[in-house]
């Protein structure tokens, strides 16, 4: 039996186990997905133990996404983003960041072209992944953040990117082709990071928030004629990418999606 899993603290509310277990069942794989919850100071020991026990791969969640960079060799994209969310133990353990693929594959699934101008709201982990992913697709990326210095600092790392404060969204969003909310704003029903007057037809909006699935931003974007993509799609496709890295097989997207959404 092949063993995969999730390492983080806490992990009890993660939806990754049912999503990956659904993939194994759909493909008839003899595999299990388990969770590991070490204390912060035990990360090195936990990863060494997982490798010694023959664990094939791990997803990584808070608070370890950055700490893992000191333990396993990251691939070039994970190194640029500055975070690892997937470890492949085949051969020399390698760290990957599949959040970037989660963004791109979510847009691909909804037939959204990644060309023109993108606005990314948020300069944290999800914002970094989205900014690098869209820049690598050839898009001009504008990063807006409550703390402007974080946006401008990230923009110096991302090709063809600029950093802005949230007050500049009024100028940025009306001309954008793609908008990504990479903040937690929207978890409260009446909050949105972008006023509805800036949303427009022809815009594609991805909201990384997945609880609730239908955020105020997505409702107002839909009313404005924009293409809307909820956060579960990004969550799904980062998991799909991890599955494919570990197994070398095409992931069964629909069973994984059904299991994920049933768990939210």
From Swiss-Prot:
Its EC number(s): 1.1.1.25
UniProt pathway: Metabolic intermediate biosynthesis; chorismate biosynthesis; chorismate from D-erythrose 4-phosphate and phosphoenolpyruvate: step 4/7
Active-site annotation: 65 (proton acceptor)
Classification via HAMAP family: Shikimate_DH_AroE
GO process annotations (BP): amino acid biosynthetic process; aromatic amino acid family biosynthetic process; chorismate biosynthetic process; shikimate metabolic process
A GO term for molecular function: shikimate 3-dehydrogenase (NADP+) activity
Keywords: Amino-acid biosynthesis, Aromatic amino acid biosynthesis, NADP, Oxidoreductase
Xref: NCBIfam families: aroE, PRK00258.3-3
Subunit structure: Homodimer.
Gene3D superfamilies noted in UniProt: Leucine Dehydrogenase, chain A, domain 1 (3.40.50.10860), NAD(P)-binding Rossmann-like Domain (3.40.50.720)
Binding site for NADP(+): 122-126, 145-150, 208, 231
Binding annotation for shikimate: 14-16, 61, 85, 99, 210
EC supergroup of this enzyme: oxidoreductase
InterPro entries in UniProt: Aminoacid_DH-like_N_sf (IPR046346), NAD(P)-bd_dom_sf (IPR036291), SDH_C (IPR041121), Shikimate_DH (IPR011342), Shikimate_DH-bd_N (IPR013708), Shikimate_DH_fam (IPR022893), Shikm_DH/Glu-tRNA_Rdtase (IPR006151)
Domain of life: Archaea
Family named by the database record: Belongs to the shikimate dehydrogenase family.
Protein name as it appears in the record: Shikimate dehydrogenase (NADP(+))
Catalyzed reaction equations: shikimate + NADP(+) = 3-dehydroshikimate + NADPH + H(+)
Function statement: Involved in the biosynthesis of the chorismate, which leads to the biosynthesis of aromatic amino acids. Catalyzes the reversible NADPH linked reduction of 3-dehydroshikimate (DHSA) to yield shikimate (SA).
């Amino acid at each position: 039996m092949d063993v995969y899993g999730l390492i983080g603290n806490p992990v009890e509310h993660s939806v990754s186990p049912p999503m990956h277990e659904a993939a194994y069942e759909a493909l008839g794989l003899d595999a299990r997905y388990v969770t590991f919850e070490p204390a912060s100071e035990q990360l090195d020991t936990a990863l060494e133990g997982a490798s010694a026990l023959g664990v094939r791969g791990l997803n990584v969640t808070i608070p370890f996404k950055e700490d893992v960079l000191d333990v396993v060799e990251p691939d070039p994209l994970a190194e640029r983003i500055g975070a690892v969310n997937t470890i492949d133990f085949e051969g020399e353990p390698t760290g990957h960041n599949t959040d970037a693929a989660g963004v791109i594959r979510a847009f691909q699934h909804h037939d959204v072209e990644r060309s023109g101008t993108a606005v990314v709201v948020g300069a944290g982990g999800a914002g970094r992944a989205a900014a690098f992913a869209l820049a690598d697709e050839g898009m001009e990326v504008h990063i807006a953040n409550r703390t402007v210095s974080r946006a401008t600092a990230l923009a110096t790392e991302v090709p063809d990117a600029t950093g802005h404060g949230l007050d500049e969204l009024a100028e940025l969003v009306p001309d954008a082709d793609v908008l990504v909310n990479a903040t937690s704003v929207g978890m409260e029903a009446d909050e949105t990071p972008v006023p509805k007057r800036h949303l427009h037809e022809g815009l594609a909006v991805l909201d990384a928030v997945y609880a609730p699935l239908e955020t105020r931003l997505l409702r107002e974007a839909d009313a404005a004629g924009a293409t809307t993509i909820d956060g579960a799609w990004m969550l799904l496709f980062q998991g799909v990418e991890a599955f494919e890295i570990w197994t070398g097989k095409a992931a069964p997207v629909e069973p994984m999606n059904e299991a994920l959404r049933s768990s939210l």
